[in-house]
Amino acid sequence: MKRIYLDNAATSFPKAPGTADVIKTFLEKDCTNISRTTGQKGMETYERITNLRSGIAELLNLSTPESVILNSGATESLNLIIKGLFNPGDHVLVSSCEHNSLMRPLVQNGISFSRIPCDRQGYILTDRIGELVRPETKAILICAAGNVSGAVQDIGTIAEIAKKNDINLFIDAAQNIVDLNIDMEAMGIASVVFSGHKDLLGPEGTGGVALRKDIAQTIRPLISGGMGSKSDTEEIPDILPDRLEAGTQNIGGLLALAHSFSYRVENRKQLHEQERRVTELLFRGLESIEGIKIVGAPLDRPRTDVISITSDKMDIADISQLFLERYGIETRVGLHCSPSSHKALGTYPTGTLRFSPGPFTTQEEIGITVDAMKEIING
């Protein structure tokens, strides 16, 4: 049975061509520890990872590539921001459609928050932000694209509101960093969190955060330890990115991310158009089936490839299992680590069945999926 993978919102598959080869070559031939080992491979590896920082900074129009921090991904980056910048009792604004990677650190660390309402399609009601701002509000933290609704938020308008109220805006772009068209300098954005294994088509356990330099210089590090620089002191050095990258990194993974990032950016138009075609095809096919209801962003508003559904004919968990057992189709069912999103969308506590095709999903695979849904629903 052919594998049909429709869970790219959880992790991308297939990865960018050649990504696995980069990791294999590093482990078998080029293994080294950057900023530690004195050797040709170490210098070459350092340069490749530096180029990755520069590429991300260029994508986001950030003039300080040294403040692009590379780590295990979006969850670690959000923990760095929340634990490094805020204190118990501080107040922030979040949307009512946030992921647990943001909400759990806020709750764990006693940070007070107000939720900006979203509509039933998952879009932030930007005209409600101003009324929630308090004198003690420190920041707005939002996910740029919903992993349940697929809704892409109006970052430009939210950035203007943040500027007007003189508060920092922090963006979680784990789902769609390349196509957001973020300009950190012009928009005054404090940070952009990104994941390597989703939109960037790289390996799991990679990602990071692009920080405005003044924040990168003052944020409390999440961890501390050896960095390969300023080893004569037991104090954390003020060098960037070193002060926020203690310990040996996932070097092979970051080299693979550098490769997949270049591929993703160089082919962004082609990949976006392919993803859009299969997403629209799947959306149209599913909405035509009696007993299936699409939840979240419509096709005529800014959206990603995420399509969530509910059904009044069958349990969505049963549908997901039948997809796998009968057709080899992989989806995700439940709350998707975002109970607040489901509360806002009216699908809590059952959740939704989520499809998320990717740039390598074929129209044939979408056709098989739609036909499979018809067979399952009609028994």
Regions found by a protein language model. Give the residues of each.
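Pyridoxal 5′-phosphate
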Residues: 1-379
